[in-house]
Design a protein with these regions (language model features):
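Alpha-helical transmembrane segments and their immediate juxtamembrane cytosolic regions
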Residues: 1-367
């Protein structure tokens, strides 16, 4: 998820992921008051993760050192992502089909598909498969899967089927010819309208309905097309400013995920606007801007790889105090949970940078 020296940065992907971050704040802030099915933050976030992952797989193909890299960091995200589950839902540390667990498993699937297909476009063309599996499997299966490893494949929450489809669609839309984006948008829009008309109700996000799938694919396509449009105007000061406004959170998305919980918990203002829609718009922008400022400071700190061992020590020490029941103040755990989560995000990025740099040096020496 985080950038590394090898992965490079595709600006339009960072911009689109930044848009997903903005939608994430809106989704968690508004809850069910205005949009019962949330926003399309997760599909867009997942699609951008699929793009970045496939690009890095292509760039590091042939370097055996990166084979371990591509296995280790999804596993680290899978288990370390339990800190996000605690922050979002409370309770103790546990491994469930959560947001980061879905990302980790999907990255491993992309790694496998990247080994099977030399060209990434056929990988992207598989995006309907997870959705079809989800729609064809009986809902009753989820009850028997609950509490077992199979729940990560199918069930409540961010199960691999159907959410893997958005990672694959990200690869698809990345390789789709730019000049043919309008016919694709028209086809998705027509299909989404038809699905909404047939459904006759609110699209279901979890136990995903066909209407939600098509609307989400349309939203991802529109966001990425807009991101490309913004990038295309990078010679103008306004376009560059807008690009950086979204790209900064996009290239620091893991830290943003944890940071936005902190702001939602402690920085939300009272509703003093005459209409809730105004409150939603301005509060979302205010929280996003607050995240942006903090991420600007963080982006400088993450370049300091000398912080790796102090961050490891602090994460382990704080985690031991929290989960060992050794904290004295009763109100401390929520704040400490946030601190441990943000430290994990920082540690994850530092480790990736360190590991990628070492792999690159090994490749240069071998060459």
């Amino acid at each position: 998820m985080a950038g590394t020296p090898t992965s490079g940065r595709i600006v339009e992907i960072d911009i689109a992921k930044g848009m997903a971050c903005l939608l994430m704040i809106a989704a968690h802030f508004v809850s069910a008051r205005l949009i019962p099915f949330g926003t399309f933050a997760a599909p867009l976030f997942f699609a951008c993760s699929g793009m970045n992952t496939m690009l890095m797989l292509e760039k590091t193909r042939g370097n055996r050192c990166f084979d371990f890299f591509h296995l280790f960091f999804p596993l680290l995200l899978f288990f370390g992502g339990s800190t996000q589950v605690v922050i979002a839902h409370g309770g103790g540390l546990r491994i469930v089909p959560g947001f980061l667990q879905c990302i980790a498993l999907s990255l491993l699937v992309l790694l496998l598909l990247g080994r099977v297909f030399r060209n990434s476009f056929p990988v992207g063309c598989l995006f309907p498969v997870p959705f079809l599996i989800h729609l064809l499997l009986p809902v009753s299966l989820s009850a028997s899967f609950r509490g077992t490893p199979l729940a990560f494949l199918y069930g409540k929450g961010f199960a691999l089927f159907p959410w893997l489809g958005f990672f694959l669609f990200g690869v698809f839309i990345l390789r789709w010819p730019r000049q043919r984006i309008l016919p694709l948008l028209a086809a998705l829009g027509t299909a989404a309208v038809a699905a909404l008309a047939l459904a006759g109700g609110v699209p279901r996000k979890f136990w995903m309905s066909p209407a939600y799938i098509l609307l989400a694919l349309l939203a991802v396509s529109l966001a990425f097309a807009l991101a490309r449009r913004i990038t295309g105007g990078a010679d103008r000061a306004v376009s560059r400013g807008v690009a950086e406004f979204f790209a900064l959170p996009g290239r620091n998305a893991l830290m943003f995920l944890y940071l936005h919980y902190f702001l939602l918990r402690y920085f939300v203002s009272v509703d003093f606007f005459p209409h809730f829609c105004l409150y939603l718009i301005f509060e979302t922008l205010y929280l996003f801007c607050a995240c942006w400022v903090l991420l600007r400071l963080y982006e400088k700190a993450k370049l300091e790889t000398t912080l790796l061992f102090p961050v490891i020590f602090l994460t382990l020490a704080l985690g031991t105090l929290r989960w060992g029941g050794l904290l004295k103040p009763k109100g401390a755990p929520p704040m400490v949970d946030l601190a441990v989560g943000m430290l994990f995000a920082f540690l994850y990025v530092l480790l990736r940078r360190k590991f990628a740099s070492r792999c690159e040096r090994g490749m240069a020496a071998a060459g």
